[in-house]
């Protein structure tokens, strides 16, 4: 297999995108929900030194001066904490003391001493901007007071541990870096938690008890509950309600990751030819993402040729592509923990067959109409799914793929069997973002959702004409809800038939 020729590939991509990947650089991002208060900004500063994560001093090519993480200030993280504390106290009881415990993720290992790439707990990161494992955010709001205290438990500096695993921030710098009231070693948390809970009553302990981010912390919290007089409540519903509506800084971060993902899918198209493997196409996508500024993929990609595309979560990606195949890719990338999620389908030969073109344009028409509906009606995502089933059934019937002698309800049911997955989910720090926010509420400004209709016809599906069998097609874009028409964040990823045919196979791998 020949080495990927990036120089010739650039000219291919330039024809179909707003900007060239080779010239792409991270933008310096806005970070405020509203005009900043100069007096509040003066309270914050990023200390100089080598810490447990990049800073604007050590990585100015990634983080603008004054920001804690890419595009987001200390002030914004603090405002998020203030909002959460206020929401929780109002929801339960203002006359009780409220204790909030949000643990960071801990390192995970695939085998002895071999770690997985660390991925921070999204809720913890959203509130702190801290990227260190096994830390703990502790907040306490005394009864009948407007103030609250924030304590961050982190690993203390340790020269031996840092020799092996890299720098730690330590307690001394953590207070300033993360703009918290106090920082303590994680080893103190057990005794601190027991003392705090046992000395307070009545107290509401806010902690996510299901699928804990850190089992060690989970055990401490559970044991402290037995000793004290606390009632247990889950903060995650309130956190997800906050997270589902993106700040201006988050919108910019999502634009970046969606742009990178879009260009990487374009490049995967350009490298597709009969005879190469699904794995090779997957590798081109991942390589382009990383070279363009993403840390890694958002999830294991689906790269499914031919009838394998009828298996919705096919991730083996180990078969060779045939000339007559359609290729479905469902992939995304992660940049500063924010995710893109894109699906495209194209002919391996670079030319749609007549029957493949009918199916593809049918799915594309459904997707375009659903995006229009998001702007016109702002429906709940569950209602958008109902629209998809109705439109898909109607269009399939018009093309003669489904019979004309069935009523509307049966038609919707047949469409659902051909596309059994939901048409949309929220997107952000997690691919399936804010899962506790129901999909039956209307969408609002600054939500980001996917729109991903598909059709999957197995090779042995005798209910459709033979020429349409053994094909899976999905088209997915990431969409920002605005006052006007929804903004498609993945609009540089080609999806029109003519554009696809112009780009597929134009680069050797």
PLM feature segments, named:
Residues 2-9, 13-509:
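Active-site neighborhoods and metal-handling regions in enzymes and metal-associated proteins
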């Amino acid at each position: 297999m020949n080495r990927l020729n990036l120089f010739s590939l650039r000219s291919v991509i330039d024809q179909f995108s707003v900007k060239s990947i080779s010239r792409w650089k991270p933008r310096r991002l806005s970070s405020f929900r509203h005009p900043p208060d100069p007096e509040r900004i003066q309270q914050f500063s990023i200390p100089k030194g080598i810490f447990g994560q990049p800073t604007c001093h050590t990585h100015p090519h990634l983080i603008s001066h004054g920001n804690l993480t890419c595009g987001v200030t200390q002030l914004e993280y603090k405002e998020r904490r203030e909002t959460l504390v206020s929401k929780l106290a109002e929801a339960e009881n203002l006359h009780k003391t409220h204790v909030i415990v949000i643990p960071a993720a801990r390192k995970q290992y695939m085998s002895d001493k071999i770690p997985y790439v660390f991925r921070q707990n999204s809720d913890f990161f959203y509130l702190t901007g801290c990227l260190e494992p096994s830390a703990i955010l502790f907040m306490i709001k005394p009864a009948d007071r407007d103030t609250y205290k924030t304590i961050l438990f982190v690993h203390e500096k340790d020269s031996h541990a840092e020799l092996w695993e890299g720098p730690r921030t330590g307690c001394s710098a953590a207070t300033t870096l993360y703009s918290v009231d106090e920082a303590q070693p994680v080893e103190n948390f057990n005794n601190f938690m027991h003392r705090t809970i046992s000395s307070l009553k009545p107290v509401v302990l806010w902690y996510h008890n299901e699928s804990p981010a850190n089992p060690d912390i989970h055990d401490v919290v559970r044991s402290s509950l037995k000793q004290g007089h606390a009632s247990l409540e889950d903060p995650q519903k309130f956190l997800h309600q906050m997270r589902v509506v993106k700040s201006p800084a988050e919108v910019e971060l999502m634009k970046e990751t969606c742009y990178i993902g879009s260009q990487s899918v374009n490049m995967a198209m350009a490298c597709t030819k009969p005879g190469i493997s699904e794995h090779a196409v997957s590798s081109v996508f991942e390589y382009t993402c990383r070279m363009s500024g993403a840390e890694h993929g958002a999830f294991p990609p689906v790269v499914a040729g031919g009838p394998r595309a009828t298996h919705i979560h096919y991730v083996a990606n180990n078969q060779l592509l045939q000339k007559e195949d359609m290729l479905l890719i469902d992939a995304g990338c992660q940049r500063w923990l924010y995710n893109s999620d894109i699906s495209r389908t194209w002919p391996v030969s670079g030319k749609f067959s007549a029957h493949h073109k009918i199916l593809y344009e049918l799915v594309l028409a459904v997707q375009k109409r659903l995006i229009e509906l998001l702007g016109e009606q702002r429906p709940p995502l569950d209602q958008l799914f109902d629209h998809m089933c109705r439109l898909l059934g109607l269009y399939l019937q018009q093309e003669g793929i489904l019979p004309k002698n069935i009523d509307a309800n049966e038609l919707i049911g047949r469409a659902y069997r051909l596309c059994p997955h939901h048409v949309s989910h929220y997107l952000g720090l997690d691919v399936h973002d804010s899962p506790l926010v129901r999909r039956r509420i209307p969408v609002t400004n600054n939500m980001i959702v996917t729109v991903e209709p598909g059709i999957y016809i197995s090779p042995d599906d005798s209910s459709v004409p033979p020429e349409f069998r053994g094909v899976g097609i999905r088209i997915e874009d990431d969409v920002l809800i605005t006052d006007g028409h929804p903004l498609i964040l993945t609009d540089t990823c080609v999806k029109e038939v003519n554009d696809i045919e112009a780009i597929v196979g134009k680069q050797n791998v």
